[in-house]
UniProtKB/Swiss-Prot annotation:
The keyword Hydrolase does not apply. The lineage of its organism: Archaea, Methanobacteriati, Methanobacteriota, Stenosarchaea group, Methanomicrobia. The chain crosses the membrane at residues 1-21, 41-61, 62-82, 105-127, 139-159, 163-183. This is Putative manganese efflux pump MntP. The keyword Protease does not apply. GO terms for cellular component: plasma membrane. Belongs to the MntP (TC 9.B.29) family. InterPro entries: Mntp/YtaF, Put_MntP. GO terms for molecular function: manganese ion transmembrane transporter activity. Probably functions as a manganese efflux pump. Keywords: Cell membrane, Ion transport, Manganese, Membrane, Transmembrane, Transmembrane helix, Transport. It comes from the Archaea. Its main location: membrane.
């Protein structure tokens, strides 16, 4: 595969991570550059790791991925989005959220990288070498996640608490989109 093809694949896979990073950037107060770096490392790392797991697992997990992965991604994103909305409505009145703990980052990273696992499986079936695509996918996702978190912070800074509700709705909407695509509704 050419560099351009791998780069475009990385962009496509990074869109969910970008949206979730932007949503996270809107809600975390106080926001630090280290928060954006944490998001970028988790999302970039998982987007790079999952194709490798798919490539190694190949056909052994292909049925599971195609049948259940969209449901898992939907469940994780709906749960996290619902939690964000609940916290915005009933949580800390100062609106300070620290949703970037490691367990939350892990769940978000898994939810946004399940499609990369399927890409790894397709690489295995096609006999595609894995190293170059994985490096490019991970780097593109790292940069997009970092930029998404910073952009989210800039936007969220103006809207304060209401943005956490919007962030939760974005995560739920992303989960619904993943599920709708799987069910061929869109």
């Amino acid at each position: 595969m050419s560099f351009l093809t791998n780069f475009l694949l990385g962009l496509g896979l990074a869109m969910d991570a970008f949206a979730v990073s932007m949503s996270s950037g809107t809600t975390v107060r106080p926001f630090k550059v280290s928060d954006a770096l944490k998001l970028a490392v988790f999302f970039g790392g998982f987007q790079a790791l999952m194709p490798v797991l798919g490539w190694v697992g190949g056909s052994a997990v292909s049925g599971f991925v195609s049948d259940y992965a969209p449901w898992i991604a939907f469940g994780l994103l709906a749960f996290i989005g619902g939690k964000m909305i609940y916290e915005a409505l009933y949580g800390d009145p100062d609106g300070k959220v620290n949703s970037l703990n490691y367990s939350m980052l892990f769940l978000l990273a898994v939810a946004t990288s399940i499609d990369a696992l399927a890409v790894g499986i397709s690489f295995a079936f096609l006999g595609t070498p894995i190293l170059e695509p994985v490096i490019i996918i991970g780097c593109v996702t790292f940069v997009m996640s970092f930029c998404g978190a910073v952009l989210g912070y800039r936007i969220g800074h103006f809207f304060e608490n209401e943005v956490e509700i919007l962030g939760g709705l974005i995560l739920i909407g992303l989960g619904v989109k993943i599920l709708a695509e799987h069910m061929d509704w869109i």
